């Protein structure tokens, strides 16, 4: 994926997070609760929970909200049991899409996701139809400022175990293997770096270059999917037109 497309995706996600902060906190809270249910509430012993908490902090989620989600997952507070489901399909212009869902009602979420695809120029596919086009990676984004030396940071993250380091318009984008994400993130935290975002994501092996019109159509489908309370993340292999602002 080109640097422009990576940074566009991050900007778009961050802009929506700022505009819909309460909804974003709810979605991250669900991830935290599921991480606790599957691996326990001890941060030291649960790397998935540590990753979720880091993601929450990068989104400026208050600690009391984070702690409440942990308690729900541990059964100390009343909560809901969520199931994780990955839907696969194609958007406009043949863009491959993965839709990550946490739901307490599979029928509702399946209906909502199918409706979004059908009404916005896409097609919901069978399991496995596009997953092979993506790899699970860690992605850490750090905002540029005068106190950060690019070469020094690049050497640090590569020493920490990162796979790739990219310098974009306003940020540095660090990519890791899934199994190295926690180690790299925690090493950067110890160096007092602050993150625009820090999360596991699905990175496409190849991208589909879009016209301005198709960029708008694909983004509309992404927006509709992300408006669903059950949808946690939407991954795709679109490379948006450089004139597209989202």
From Swiss-Prot:
Q: What is its main location?
A: cytoplasm
Q: Listed GO molecular functions?
A: DNA binding
InterPro entries for the chain: Integrase-like_N, TACO1_YebC-like_2nd/3rd_dom, TACO1_YebC_N, Transcrip_reg_TACO1-like, Transcrip_reg_TACO1-like_dom3, YebC-like
Q: Is the keyword DNA-binding in the record?
A: yes
Q: Under what name is this protein listed?
A: Probable transcriptional regulatory protein CA_C2295
HAMAP family hit by this protein: Transcrip_reg_TACO1
Regarding protein family, the annotation reads: Belongs to the TACO1 family.
List the keywords (alphabetical): Cytoplasm, DNA-binding, Transcription, Transcription regulation
One cellular-component annotation, GO: cytosol
The record's subcellular locations are: Cytoplasm
| Gene3D superfamilies linked | 1.10.10.200, 3.30.70.980
Q: Name one GO biological process term.
A: regulation of DNA-templated transcription
Q: Which Pfam families match?
A: TACO1_YebC_N, Transcrip_reg
Indicate whether Cytoplasm appears among the record's keywords.
Answer: yes
């Amino acid at each position: 994926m080109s640097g422009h497309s990576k940074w566009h995706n991050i900007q778009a996600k961050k802009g929506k997070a700022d505009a819909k902060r309460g909804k974003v906190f709810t979605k991250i809270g669900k991830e935290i609760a599921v991480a606790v249910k599957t691996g326990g509430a001890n941060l030291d012993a649960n790397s998935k929970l540590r990753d979720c908490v880091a993601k929450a902090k990068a989104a400026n989620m208050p600690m009391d909200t984070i702690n409440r989600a942990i308690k729900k997952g541990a059964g100390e507070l009343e909560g809901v049991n969520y199931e994780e489901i990955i839907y696969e399909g194609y958007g406009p212009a043949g863009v491959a899409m993965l839709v990550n869902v946490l739901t307490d009602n599979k029928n509702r979420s399946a209906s909502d996701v199918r409706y979004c695809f059908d009404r916005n120029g896409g097609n919901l596919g069978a399991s496995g139809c596009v997953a092979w086009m993506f790899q699970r990676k860690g992605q850490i984004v750090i905002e540029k400022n005068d106190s950060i030396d690019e070469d020094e940071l690049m050497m640090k993250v590569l020493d920490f175990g990162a796979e790739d380091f990219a310098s974009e318009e306003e940020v540095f984008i660090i990519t890791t293997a899934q199994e190295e994400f926690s180690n790299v993130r925690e090493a950067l935290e110890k160096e007092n770096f602050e993150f625009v975002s820090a999360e596991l994501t699905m990175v496409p092996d190849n991208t589909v270059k879009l016209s301005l019109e198709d960029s708008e159509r694909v983004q509309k489908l992404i927006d509709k999917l992300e408006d669903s309370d059950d949808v946690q993340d939407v991954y795709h292999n679109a490379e948006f037109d450089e004139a597209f602002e989202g």
